Swiss-Prot record:
<feature type="binding site">
    <location>
        <position position="310"/>
    </location>
    <ligand>
        <name>Mn(2+) 2</name>
    </ligand>
</feature>
<comment type="function">
    <text>Isomerase that catalyzes the conversion of deoxy-ribose 1-phosphate (dRib-1-P) and ribose 1-phosphate (Rib-1-P) to deoxy-ribose 5-phosphate (dRib-5-P) and ribose 5-phosphate (Rib-5-P), respectively.</text>
</comment>
<comment type="pathway">
    <text>Carbohydrate degradation; 2-deoxy-D-ribose 1-phosphate degradation; D-glyceraldehyde 3-phosphate and acetaldehyde from 2-deoxy-alpha-D-ribose 1-phosphate: step 1/2.</text>
</comment>
<feature type="binding site">
    <location>
        <position position="305"/>
    </location>
    <ligand>
        <name>Mn(2+) 2</name>
    </ligand>
</feature>
<dbReference type="InterPro" id="IPR024052">
    <property type="entry name" value="Phosphopentomutase_DeoB_cap_sf"/>
</dbReference>
<feature type="binding site">
    <location>
        <position position="347"/>
    </location>
    <ligand>
        <name>Mn(2+) 1</name>
    </ligand>
</feature>
<feature type="binding site">
    <location>
        <position position="358"/>
    </location>
    <ligand>
        <name>Mn(2+) 2</name>
    </ligand>
</feature>
<keyword id="KW-0963">Cytoplasm</keyword>
<feature type="binding site">
    <location>
        <position position="11"/>
    </location>
    <ligand>
        <name>Mn(2+) 1</name>
    </ligand>
</feature>
<dbReference type="GO" id="GO:0005829">
    <property type="term" value="C:cytosol"/>
</dbReference>
<dbReference type="InterPro" id="IPR017850">
    <property type="entry name" value="Alkaline_phosphatase_core_sf"/>
</dbReference>
<feature type="binding site">
    <location>
        <position position="346"/>
    </location>
    <ligand>
        <name>Mn(2+) 1</name>
    </ligand>
</feature>
<comment type="similarity">
    <text>Belongs to the phosphopentomutase family.</text>
</comment>
<protein>
    <recommendedName>
        <fullName>Phosphopentomutase</fullName>
        <ecNumber>5.4.2.7</ecNumber>
    </recommendedName>
</protein>
<dbReference type="GO" id="GO:0006018">
    <property type="term" value="P:2-deoxyribose 1-phosphate catabolic process"/>
</dbReference>
<dbReference type="GO" id="GO:0008973">
    <property type="term" value="F:phosphopentomutase activity"/>
</dbReference>
<dbReference type="GO" id="GO:0000287">
    <property type="term" value="F:magnesium ion binding"/>
</dbReference>
Length: 407
């Protein structure tokens, strides 16, 4: 076996609108560049936290800005002032039809999503009457609240008090293929929320819905806060992913954060939960200290998307990027001679863009390790090139069905 692989997914960190962005209403989106420019204009200053230009020295040294320039062609930074990147760098184009978390992650692991997800229309009472009535019946509920497209933080402020008073869970959706259920951890019960999400998962299968998401919250009216006990109930990938093949080959597949949920807990040998980007980084470091040869450590950093991208918090996103960047040296010192680290994203979520939804963008593809030289890998025509490269490095007995290795 040849070394280990660590994959860090910066959830929603796009680096330029894709050629098909018009189909999604995302022409001009660019998560990285727009954050960079907002910082440069002084619009992302946070008293006592951050100020001025976006500072990502470690990601820059791995080729992030070179990849972003190649992706969009926008001359947002003087590349001649930067050192030659110390690893492989480029960008990837999504082949999956969606711009969502499962599509991006599954494609990255060798399974592009070539079918259309089901979506709920953006109108009041957006869910089919049959679905809601059966959900209420099977869960023994007095009813439901919401039934619309909404921001998760706004809808709990709007309906949280009524939810506590009536015992009716809040159901809502977004532009993604999701059925989301919010409930108060104490008043409704966390386990009860999980139980009704499992029922909902079975009910929405016929509608081709990608995920049912438990959105627990706590606190009192006027100060409700979502907790870290979110759970995603995903439909399983339609084919075996890289994770399945590694597990079948006797490898350790260590899923950190919501990775196990995204892959419907398939192909995973160990699940580690953590809340918040810094706790997720801590968990990644701990896993890398003990992960055996031939293993995969796979982490999703969800805060970029859920806390800053969807909420269109440009300054918060900038600060989160700088926090993430500052910790990369801690990971590098743990790498063994043949280890490789891959940094990528699953889609975009430009915090400067209208609305609150994901944006159809290219993703960065950065790869480094003790024995990795500098190489521009250019445009990758499928996220699955990442999975194929991992499969080659970990010496799987046969290649994945999709993707071209860039090793």
């Amino acid at each position: 076996m040849t070394g280990r692989v660590c994959v860090l997914v910066m959830d929603s960190f796009g680096i330029g609108a894709s050629l098909d962005a018009a189909r999604y209403g995302d022409v001009g989106a660019n998560t990285l560049v727009h954050i960079y420019e907002a910082c440069k204009r002084g619009e992302c200053d946070i008293d006592g936290v951050r100020k001025g230009s976006l500072m990502l020295p470690n990601l820059a040294s791995k080729g992030l800005y070179h990849a972003a320039m190649a992706s969009s062609g926008l001359p947002f930074i003087d590349l001649s002032a930067l050192a030659i990147p110390s690893g492989y760098y480029g960008y990837a184009v999504e082949q999956s039809l969606g711009k969502d978390t499962p599509s991006g992650h599954w494609e990255m692991a060798g399974v592009p999503v070539t079918f259309e997800w089901g979506y709920f229309p953006d109108k009041p009472y957006c869910f089919p009457e049959e679905l809601i009535s059966e959900f209420i019946k099977q869960c023994n509920l007095p009813g439901v609240l919401g039934e619309k497209h909404a921001s998760g933080t706004i809808i709990i402020d709007e309906l949280g008090e009524e939810h506590i008073r009536t015992g009716k869970p809040i159901v809502y959706t977004s532009a993604d293929s999701v059925f989301q259920i919010a409930a108060h951890e104490e008043a409704f019960g966390l386990q009860r929320l999980y139980d009704i999400c499992k029922i909902a998962r079975n009910l929405v299968d016929k509608y081709q819905i990608g995920r049912v998401i438990a959105r627990p919250f706590a606190g009192k009216p006027g100060s409700f806060k979502r907790t870290g006990n979110r759970k995603d109930y995903a439909t399983p990938p339609p084919e075996k992913t890289l994770l399945d093949f590694l597990k079948e080959d006797g490898r350790e597949v260590i899923a950190i954060g919501k990775i196990a949920d995204i892959y419907a807990h398939q192909g995973v040998t160990q699940e580690i939960k953590a809340d918040g980007n810094m706790a997720l980084f801590d968990a990644t470091l701990s896993a890398m200290k003990t992960a055996p040869q031939g293993s995969l450590v796979f982490t999703n950093f969800v805060d970029f998307d859920s806390s800053y991208g969807h909420r269109r918090d440009v300054a918060g996103y900038a600060h989160a990027l700088e926090q993430f960047d500052a910790r990369l040296p801690e990971l590098e010192v743990l790498l063994q001679p043949n280890d490789m680290v891959f940094i990528a994203a699953d889609h975009g979520c430009d915090p400067t863009f209208p609305g609150s939804d994901h944006t159809r963008e290219h993703i960065p593809v950065l790869m480094f390790g003790p024995q990795v030289n500098s190489k521009f890998i250019g445009r990758r025509d499928c996220f699955a090139d990442i999975g194929q490269s991992i499969a080659e490095h970990l010496q799987l007995s046969s290649p994945l069905a999709h993707g071209v290795s860039f090793l």
